[in-house]
């Protein structure tokens, strides 16, 4: 069993974006391929959780396994994606990453995983006062908590955190790099991110 593994969440319907965000172009490739490459600098075992409609297209861009949600929980949001990844790869800790935060640096995964220890169930950054539970790390033991929530038809990441012993990370190295955690949810945000990229 690996100590650490990565789960990339690329199964959302991207309704506000208008097309699958996982396949949006970024730095000459796609969001999902870019995220997998960045994560791959720190982690060897990575799985991508994809939606049925785009799974075959995602597989063309990444060299890691691409799976769908566990059938019984398909469509139940990020909790379903996380637990599906946990079932696919055995590890002590899982770094979670949505496919729509393309500014993330490989440094973040080093910082994140250095904070893990068995005293905690999760390590979650706080950026500008807001918890970021989808750019976080979760211990394997959280899997049973997720199953219990899904059985009760509860899908909120906040509900999961309320049941976990969480280490919140908000140090200077995180706050100084708040752009790592910016999500691209709309075409307008995508255009701004592309503009910022060209100005670097």
Curated annotation (Swiss-Prot):
EC number, UniProt record: 2.7.7.77
Names of the cofactor(s): Mg(2+)
Keyword Lipid biosynthesis part of the UniProt annotation: no
Reaction catalysed by this enzyme: Mo-molybdopterin + GTP + H(+) = Mo-molybdopterin guanine dinucleotide + diphosphate
Gene Ontology, cellular component aspect: cytoplasm
Keyword check for Cytoplasm: yes
InterPro entries: MobA-like_NTP_Trfase, Molybde_CF_guanTrfase, Nucleotide-diphossugar_trans
Any one Gene Ontology molecular-function term assigned to this protein's record: GTP binding
Main location: cytoplasm
Enzyme class: transferase
Pfam families: NTP_transf_3
Binding site for Mg(2+): 100
Residues binding GTP, per UniProt: 9-11, 21, 69, 100
Location relative to the cell: Cytoplasm
PANTHER family per record: MOLYBDENUM COFACTOR GUANYLYLTRANSFERASE (PTHR19136:SF81)
Purpose of the protein: Transfers a GMP moiety from GTP to Mo-molybdopterin (Mo-MPT) cofactor (Moco or molybdenum cofactor) to form Mo-molybdopterin guanine dinucleotide (Mo-MGD) cofactor.
Similarity comment: family membership: Belongs to the MobA family.
Name of the featured protein: Probable molybdenum cofactor guanylyltransferase
Taxonomic path: Bacteria, Bacillati, Bacillota, Bacilli, Bacillales
């Amino acid at each position: 069993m690996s100590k650490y593994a990565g789960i990339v969440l690329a199964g959302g319907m991207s309704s506000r974006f208008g097309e699958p965000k996982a396949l949006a172009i970024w730095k000459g490739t796609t969001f999902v391929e870019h995220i997998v490459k960045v994560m791959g600098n720190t982690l060897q075992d990575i799985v991508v959780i994809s939606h049925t409609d785009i799974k075959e297209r995602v597989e063309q861009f990444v060299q890691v396994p691409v799976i769908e949600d566990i059938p019984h929980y398909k469509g139940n949001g990020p909790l379903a994606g996380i637990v599906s990844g946990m079932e696919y790869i055995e590890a002590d800790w899982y770094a979670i990453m949505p496919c729509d935060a393309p500014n993330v640096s490989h440094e973040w995964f080093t910082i994140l995983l250095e904070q893990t220890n068995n005293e905690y169930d999760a390590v979650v950054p706080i950026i500008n006062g807001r918890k970021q539970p989808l750019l976080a790390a979760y211990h394997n033991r959280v899997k049973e908590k997720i199953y219990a929530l899904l059985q009760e038809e509860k899908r909120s990441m906040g509900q999961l955190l309320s049941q976990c012993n969480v280490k919140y990370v908000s140090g200077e190295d995180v706050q100084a790099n708040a752009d790592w955690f910016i999500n691209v949810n709309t075409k307008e945000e995508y255009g701004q991110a592309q503009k910022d990229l060209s100005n670097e």
